[in-house]
Amino acid sequence: MQATTGQSTSHQRPNRNKQSATWCLMLGAIVSAGISPAAPQSAGAAEPVEKMADAAESVPRPPVDDNDLRRWLENMIWHHRFTVDEITAATGLAPAEIVAAQARFDVRPDNRPARAADSPLLLLPYPGGRHPRLGFRDGAVRPRRETKFSVFTPWDPTSYVVVDLPEAIWSQHGLIWLAHEHVPTVWTKQGIELPVLEWQRDGEQGLSLARKLPNGVAFTAHAVAAADAIRMELKFENGSTESFSDLRVQICAMLGHAAGFAEQTNDNKVFRDPYVACRSTDGQRWIITAWEGCQRAWANAPCPCLHSDPKFADSAPGSSQQLRGWLSFYEGNDLDAELARIEATNWRAAPAR
């Protein structure tokens, strides 16, 4: 996401995975039973499916096997409510293959398992194929899905926030990580393509991603769902032989697919460093995020999104450090009391595990 300080972000396009010719055999006979996912029900997503897929410019990631295919179909159909065209954009599979797989695994919009009322917030990897932003998409071309996860609202199972953890990391050398393409990074300037990764399950309710950069620096992201919040961590490890400074991080919470929060304005936002909150159109609900070490609390109206962007301390060779973050939902009209309640949880000291 482009910062208003004049610095902008980019990402090197990863290698395109080739769709295996064996998928037709693996998926079995094509079924013409008329099974297809429901149309997208995300807030503000009034664009035609074809336009949405075009704008996303996603690099498809074919499933690695049947288990992977089934997990992604459940993710995309049961929860994100993707259309067949959007699943094609995410996976590279042909529409007929997708329909056949839906029939084989019996994954339909109307047979999603019910969740218990006391379940943790639903936290899922974001599948790609549908752009997570409503606007300013030219500032996030070919978004990489491996740093993005969806958190579904407790009041509407079809609405979700997409968190990019991290969207970007700067150092004194420039941009060392970017989760999409926009402007050159230190790696694209050298012609280096970073490998494609995926979120890994971290316990029953968590996700984890570890990436090592070509210079020996590594970062690890964690997100864990509880009933009241998503607790997050970002760890920075300096495995290089030089010190790093000016380690600024962008962590983006995109609201365009959360009903009632998709207005492209900052008039519905509240900034109380480190807390950034967005009010729903009816004024009765809030989405709240915060990070320790916040050096800039802001929002980008066209996206729309929330930022509580932190900064790591300077990093000597061999050192490591971590920052903790928070995302939650609130129903009520006393934001001050809710922020005080969140502060009292001592979330900065609680590990995301």
Can you annotate each of these PLM segments?
Residues 66-81:
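Short, amphipathic alpha-helical "recognition" segments used to contact nucleic acids or chromatin
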Residues 21-36:
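Bacterial N-terminal signal peptides
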Residues 173-226, 243, 247:
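Extended, loop-rich substrate-binding clefts of extracytoplasmic carbohydrate-active enzymes
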Residues 109-126:
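Short Lys/Arg-enriched helix C-cap and helix-to-coil transition segments
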Residues 123-196, 204:
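Acidic-aromatic substrate-binding/catalytic surfaces of carbohydrate-active enzymes
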Residues 224-265:
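Acidic (Asp/Glu-rich), glycine- and aromatic
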Residues 182-194, 198-201, 281-353:
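Beta-strand-rich recognition/accessory modules
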Residues 144-168, 239, 253-319, 340:
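A contiguous, surface-exposed recognition patch within enzymatic or periplasmic domains that forms
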